[in-house]
Regions:
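Bacterial Sec-dependent N-terminal signal peptides
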Residues: 1-35
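Beta-strand-connecting loop/turn residues
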Residues: 11, 41, 158-159
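A short macromolecule-binding patch
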Residues: 170-176
Length: 176
């Protein structure tokens, strides 16, 4: 299992390679708030790249509640996952919609399972790599036997990282 980061904005992440179990990663990552130091310690592979973002970090507005069913970024044909009947609840539909909402234009993200997002973007050379965790990143988890998971970093405050998420066949929206 490994976690990688896609960055929406001029904010970056870089962590060292660590060996961990899936159980410990999920236990740490999906707690209410995760310390940046703990998150660093539990990652096996982590990399990041940066997207150009229209909104700067100063104007970034964290999403701490579910988008309404009338929000066009999540619940319309603007969202490719919604368009092809893979909409909410679904982590990829949510993260795609959130990226669209942040950027204000269509994101250059994979239309496939979450585990393919990082490699797709890296292979196409869309984004730069960085070093410091900030808001707007898309965390990408990949593990054996599943389609992976993606979530969006909404806050990094006092060493705590807050992610917004959705889950396939699960919750439409939740924070971790």
């Amino acid at each position: 299992m490994y976690i990688k980061w896609l960055q929406i904005g001029n904010n970056h992440f870089e962590f060292k390679k660590r060996s961990v179990s899936l159980r410990n990663v999920l236990k740490s990552v999906f707690s209410k708030k995760v310390s940046a130091a703990v998150l660093t310690a539990v990652m096996l592979f982590v990399s990041v790249f940066s997207m150009s973002m229209i909104a700067s970090a100063a104007s970034f507005s964290p999403r701490l509640s579910a988008p309404s069913s009338s929000n066009k970024y999540y619940y319309s044909n603007l969202n490719v996952f919604y368009r092809y009947n893979y909409g909410m609840p679904n982590c990829t539909a949510y993260a795609y919609g959130r990226a669209y909402e942040i950027l204000g234009s269509e994101p250059k993200l994979s239309w496939n399972n979450a585990e393919q997002w990082y490699g797709y973007n890296k292979a196409n050379g869309y984004y730069k790599y960085g070093q410091t965790p900030k808001v707007g990143a898309i965390a990408c988890w990949s593990y054996n036997g599943g389609g992976g998971h993606v979530a969006v970093v909404e806050k990094v405050e006092n060493g705590q990282i807050t992610f917004s998420n959705s889950a396939w066949s699960g919750k439409r929206f939740y924070l971790s």
